[in-house]
């Protein structure tokens, strides 16, 4: 029996979600415990940061997968003896961790390579972390299935509703949904971060059309695009290009007008975590480590001395071309947005 496209996509999401983040171990067997996103991101993180740190120090590192709020809640459940030493996340989730008193203040005394970071990037951490890199959340598509991809976000929404393609959208549990979908569409459709209903209305339109599958983890859109279960998806630029180069040359990527939302990846030292976390963060801030990471994942690095290949330089997100939503507002509004999404969309 062949399942309908939405059910096949859902089956993939359930399986991969369980494998990737269903039961992360937080046992403190290693000298340092750090977090990472899954898929190609984890592989690059290990190669460019974890392995060099282990080689330099002789210490061992556990890498656990999951999502920022999951890690924040784990640390918050036992702040005196946290199960994590260094957390990655978004700027808005980093602000939540800072406000809850779960992370340490940092300086170039503990992390000398902070001096190499771009001031605008360093500023997002407010002294309690820094971005490793940032990417845009635009559209990944099959060049065969979508030979004329939408050039604006409104064309994407209208084309999905009209059935020009079957689209993949992130569900509410995905890391990019709050600002990359809700905040984006609210802005595009005449609302604001204080009034996101116009954006949610567009997600409801697409869902009602039957031409959307929702995903909750980063690998499922890649698999669904390759299998033909979806034709186009809202997705991160670097991950899309990495998949194009490694497995699927049919993939195309673009940032529809008026732009795609920028997502810096924040890193923070957990309060009461191992002091080795500072040494690890110094590797994360290094030009060598970020050059490796940025070229593998094709993200724009925070270290000003990073060297890109010519191909990667032409693809990475540019500060002036991205949409930068207010992270402070997003962090405060996200619980309200999640409740609205759950009531109106439910996935």
Residue ranges and their predicted role:
Residues 138-145, 184-188, 263-276, 283-284, ...:
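A bilobed periplasmic-binding-protein/Venus flytrap-type ligand-binding module shared by bacterial periplasmic
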Residues 39-43, 83-84, 89-226:
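Extracytoplasmic ligand-binding site segments that recognize negatively charged/polar headgroups
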Residues 82-88, 214, 231-236, 252:
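Paired acidic/hydrophobic, glycine-rich loop segments that form the ligand-binding mouth/hinge
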Residues 29-95:
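Early extracytoplasmic/lumenal segment of secretory-pathway proteins
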Residues 310-347:
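Extracellular/periplasmic bilobal clamshell ligand-binding domains
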Residues 92-96, 226, 231-250:
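A ligand-binding cleft/hinge motif common to bilobed small-molecule-binding domains
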């Amino acid at each position: 029996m062949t399942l309908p496209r939405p059910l096949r996509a859902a089956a993939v999401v359930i399986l991969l979600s369980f494998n990737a983040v269903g039961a992360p171990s937080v046992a403190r067997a290693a000298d340092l415990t750090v977090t990472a996103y899954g898929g190609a991101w984890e592989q690059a993180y290990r190669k460019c940061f974890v392995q060099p740190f282990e080689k330099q120090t002789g210490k061992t590192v556990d890498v656990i997968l999951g999502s920022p709020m999951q890690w924040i809640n784990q640390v918050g459940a036992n702040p005196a003896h946290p199960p994590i030493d260094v957390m990655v996340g978004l700027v808005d989730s980093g602000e939540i961790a800072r406000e809850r008193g779960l992370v340490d203040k940092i300086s170039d005394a503990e992390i000398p390579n902070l001096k190499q970071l771009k001031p605008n990037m360093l500023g997002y951490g407010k002294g309690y972390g820094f971005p490793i890199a940032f990417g845009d959340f635009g559209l990944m598509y099959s060049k065969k299935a979508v030979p004329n991809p939408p050039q604006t976000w409104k064309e994407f929404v209208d084309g999905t509703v009209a059935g020009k393609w079957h689209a993949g959208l992130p569900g509410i549990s995905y890391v990019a949904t709050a600002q990359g979908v809700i905040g984006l569409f609210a802005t595009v459709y005449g609302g604001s971060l204080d009034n996101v209903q116009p954006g949610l209305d567009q997600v409801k339109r697409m869902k009602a059309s039957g031409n959307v599958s929702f995903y909750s983890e980063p690998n499922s859109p890649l698999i669904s695009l390759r299998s033909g279960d979806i034709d186009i998806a809202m997705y991160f630029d670097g991950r899309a290009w990495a998949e194009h180069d490694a497995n699927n040359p049919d993939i195309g990527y673009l940032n529809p007008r008026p732009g795609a939302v920028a997502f810096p990846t924040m890193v923070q030292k957990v309060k009461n975590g191992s002091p080795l976390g500072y040494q690890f963060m110094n590797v994360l801030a290094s030009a060598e480590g970020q050059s490796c990471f940025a070229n593998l994942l094709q993200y724009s690095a925070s270290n000003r001395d990073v060297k890109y290949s010519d191909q990667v330089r032409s693809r990475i997100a540019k500060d002036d071309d991205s949409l930068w939503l207010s992270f402070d507002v997003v962090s405060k509004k996200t619980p309200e947005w999640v409740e609205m999404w759950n009531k109106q969309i439910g996935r």
